[in-house]
């Protein structure tokens, strides 16, 4: 169950609305940020499980591993297949955004993944880094502008706070 204590930064009515998944069907995004252990991955996966229960196609990727695989895909010819798989999902969950530096090719690949989804699929991006720092993290101003335009103009932001939920008794 979701913990709705005052220090968590979660609004029960907003979560209930998000769990109806209208935003997924509309191809909108959710950006989930917060410190380590605040439940970003758990919340993102709750939306993913709910979407799967509604018969929607869901894909989950840790950003650094996805980009590593795509970099290999440039060399072994699997890049198009990887991008097509991600583009076909109704909901793509990109977890641990901002944990490792983006390479120039990683920035471009991330932009392509997000661009493939505009108007056709919803994306959740979860990470510790506040959204206000994403532009600087991406580094390349043109790519950063393009990525931010694709994810934030039609997105809901959830900022989780409070102490770590790991090891907390239920």
Question: PLM features: what roles do these ranges have?
Answer:
Residues 1-12:
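Charged, amphipathic alpha-helical linker segments immediately N-terminal to NTP-binding catalytic cores
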Residues 10-88, 135-138:
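Conserved P-loop
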Residues 91:
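Walker B motif beta-strand of ABC-family P-loop ATPases
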Residues 6, 34, 162:
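Flexible glycine-/small-residue-rich
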């Amino acid at each position: 169950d979701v913990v709705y204590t005052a220090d968590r930064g979660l609004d029960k009515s907003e979560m209930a609305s998000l769990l109806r998944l209208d935003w997924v069907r509309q191809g909108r995004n959710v950006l989930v940020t917060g410190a380590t252990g605040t439940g970003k991955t758990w919340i993102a996966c709750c939306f993913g499980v709910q979407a799967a229960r509604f018969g929607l196609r869901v894909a989950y990727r840790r950003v650094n591993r996805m980009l590593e695989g795509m970099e290999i895909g440039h060399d072994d010819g699997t890049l198009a297949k990887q991008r097509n798989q991600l583009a076909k999902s109704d909901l793509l969950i990109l977890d641990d955004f901002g944990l490792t530096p983006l390479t120039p090719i990683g920035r471009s690949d991330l932009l392509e993944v997000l661009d493939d989804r505009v108007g056709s699929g919803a994306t959740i991006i979860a990470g510790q880094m506040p959204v206000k720092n994403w532009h600087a993290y991406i580094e390349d101003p043109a790519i950063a502008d393009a990525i931010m335009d694709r994810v934030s103009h039609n997105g809901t932001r959830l900022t989780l706070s409070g102490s770590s939920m790991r090891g907390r008794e239920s």
